[in-house]
């Protein structure tokens, strides 16, 4: 199977999975958090706050700085985002531009806990500082 075929199949599988998730962002309590959504989309069985995903993945899952469809992008915690954030990589446009599908990032129509599809993310980091 060629790389292009694998990429296409991965994209189709991701699209099929996304189509099964209600875009209103409703889980049992009507509100999506990023962690259960990323786990549902990726199949990666890591639990706990988003800020712990990178360290928990070590030795269990492939990790790196090269984007791949189906991977989970892990954001380090910051002062405003102290639990970190995780997002499902839905498209790779270039080595520094991807699209993610994630939950509980933006306030949409006054509500948090919503799902956003194919949001563009640009890597502006100094490559030397990327793990």
What residue spans do the PLM features occupy?
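Solvent-exposed, flexible loop/coil residues
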Residues: 5, 57-58, 119, 123-125
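C-terminal segment of classical bacterial N-terminal signal peptides
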Residues: 17-25
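Conserved small/polar residues in nucleotide/adenosyl-binding loops
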Residues: 130
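Bacterial N-terminal signal peptides that target proteins for export
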Residues: 2-12
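A mature extracytoplasmic/lumenal domain signature
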Residues: 77-79, 91-93, 102-106, 123-125
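Secreted/periplasmic proteins that engage bacterial cell-wall peptidoglycan
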Residues: 27-93
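Short solvent-exposed strand/turn elements
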Residues: 97-121
């Amino acid at each position: 199977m060629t790389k292009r075929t694998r990429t296409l199949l991965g994209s189709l599988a991701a699209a099929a999975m996304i189509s099964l998730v209600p875009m209103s962002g409703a889980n049992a309590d009507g509100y999506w958090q990023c962690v259960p959504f990323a786990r549902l989309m990726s199949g990666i069985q890591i639990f706990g706050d988003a800020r712990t995903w990178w360290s928990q993945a070590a030795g269990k899952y492939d990790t790196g700085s090269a984007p791949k469809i189906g991977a989970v992008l892990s954001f380090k915690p910051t002062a405003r985002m102290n639990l970190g954030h995780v997002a499902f990589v839905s498209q790779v446009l270039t080595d520094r531009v991807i699209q993610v599908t994630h939950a509980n990032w933006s306030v949409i129509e006054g509500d948090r806990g919503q799902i956003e599809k194919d949001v563009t993310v640009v890597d502006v980091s100094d490559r030397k500082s990327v793990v």
